[in-house]
Amino acid sequence: LFKKKSAGIPFKTLELEEWSRVITRIDICCAEAEKIGIKMLIDAEESWLQPAIDEIAESLMEKYNQKEPIIYTTLQMYRKDRLLYLKAIYEKATNGGFKVGIKLVRGAYIEKENLRAYRLGNPSPICDSKKLTDKNFNNGIDFILSKLETVSLFIGSHNEESVLKVINWMTLNKVPKDHPY
C-alpha cells in the first residue's frame, strides 16, 4: 500500500478501506501519545515509500502539533532532497500554525537505494559521499537550530561531531538542557 500510495497509483476499493484502517490505527497511537504526554516518532523508509509516510506525518503534525511538537518525522539526510523537504515542511508549518518535530538521521539504506536507482536507470537519491551526507546533516541541524520557535530537533546519530555541534550551539546561545524543543 505504501509503495502504491507513494507512486500516486489510485487504490482499489478494498485497498482504500485497508489504507483508511492504517491511518486510523496510526491516529489512535498519536492520540494516546498526546493524552499521556509522550512524543511519537515516525520512522523513515526507502525513498520509494517515503512520500506516503511524509503525507501521513505531515497530516498528524498538523493535527497534534498545534501547541507543542508531539509527532516527529524522520529525515534521512543522506538523501539529496531532504534538506529542501525540511525547509518546505517548515514553511508549511509556519503558514499552517503548527509545530514540526524532526528526527535527523544520516540514513540506513545506502546500498539498497543505489542498487534500485541503478536497476531502474535513475540517478541515485543518495548523496555521492559520506562528506556530502555529513554536510547535509549539519546543514539540517543549523536550519533547525535557527527555527526553534517552530521546529523541534531529535538527533539520531552516533556521530560525536554532530552531537557536539548541537551541545556547543546550545551552550553558546544559552539554551537550557531542558529546552522543550
What residue ranges belong to the model's regions?
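Positively charged, amphipathic and often flexible ligand-engagement surfaces
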Residues: L1-Y181
